[in-house]
Amino acid sequence: MIKETDLENIPDLLIKFNEPLSNYTYTKVGGPADILAFPATIEALTELSAKAKATDTPVTVLGNASNLIVRDGGIRGLVILLEKLDSVKVAGYTIEAQAGAKLKEVTQVAQANSLTGFEFACGIPGSIGGAVFMNAGAYGGEISQVLVSCKVMDAEGNVSVLSASEMQFGYRHSVIRDKNLIVLSAKFELQAGDPTQIQNEMDRLNFLRESKQPLEYPSCGSVFKRPVGHFAGQLIQEAKLQGQRIGGVEVSKKHAGFMVNVADGNATDYEKLIALVIEKVKENSGVTLEPEVRIIGEK
């Protein structure tokens, strides 16, 4: 296991020990990370990864911790949060954003530079790294439609660039998950647009999101993938599960596809409620819901 002395001389690196991950997740649940690291440069991340490999320390990389549930026992070993790797650069019709850059901020950069095609992501509460990892999408758009390449690091510390076709994108899926890669940055190809029209479209999508989603409570976003031929929220509603509560977590009364932390809930509450919803929807409709949210850590 990596020691504090192994990390002291790495520049541009903030380290916290036994840090509750509930301080960083959108659900406000999650036990402690043994070691929580915030690299501010790619060089710091590379050196940190090398130290972890040399000491056989397990590594978990998180983006913005939005579509994620960390279990109450926390995560052993080293947890890396990429939020400080957040630079965004524009060159012509191309935007290159580091993994920790927030989607919302990247869409604002696109609008300011009269670039269209990224509006769909304006309300997704995640980072570029997490969005690429799961091919995030909303309102008919998804990352795979605009990504042209992705710079990644593997478990050995090797850095490479994957083309869009090499990403093997699917619905809420990419090769990043399959091969346990770390997203360093991504390039997006957009088109010239009118900044006023782009802003109007972003305002429209944000209004839809705010009117339909329970943004007033902590949540992990959309809990389930969309089943073929159905909408998860509608199936949950038809099973009369809106308002169903376990501990401090309930199926949102505003949007059945969300589970919200209304009263100091924990990850166990989330997992039990997810299991209950899957069971009841299956009984009611015959459809088996599949979680979209990523669940990690120890119980």
From Swiss-Prot:
Single GO MF annotation: UDP-N-acetylmuramate dehydrogenase activity
Localization annotation: Cytoplasm
Biological or metabolic pathway of the protein: Cell wall biogenesis; peptidoglycan biosynthesis
Cofactor (UniProt): FAD
InterPro entries: FAD-bd_PCMH, FAD-bd_PCMH-like_sf, FAD-bd_PCMH_sub1, FAD-bd_PCMH_sub2, MurB, MurB_C, MurB_C_sf, Oxid_FAD_bind_N
Record keyword NADP present: yes
Record-level GO BP terms: cell division; cell wall organization; peptidoglycan biosynthetic process; regulation of cell shape
EC number: 1.3.1.98
Residues of the FAD-binding PCMH-type domain: 28-193
SUPFAM superfamilies reported in the protein's UniProt record: FAD-binding/transporter-associated domain-like, Uridine diphospho-N-Acetylenolpyruvylglucosamine reductase, MurB, C-terminal domain
Superkingdom, natural source: Bacteria
Pfam entry (one): MurB_C
Catalytic residues identified in the record: 172, 222, 292
Regions annotated as coiled coil: none
Role: Cell wall formation.
The protein, known as: UDP-N-acetylenolpyruvoylglucosamine reductase
Native species: Lactococcus lactis subsp. cremoris (strain MG1363)
Gene: murB
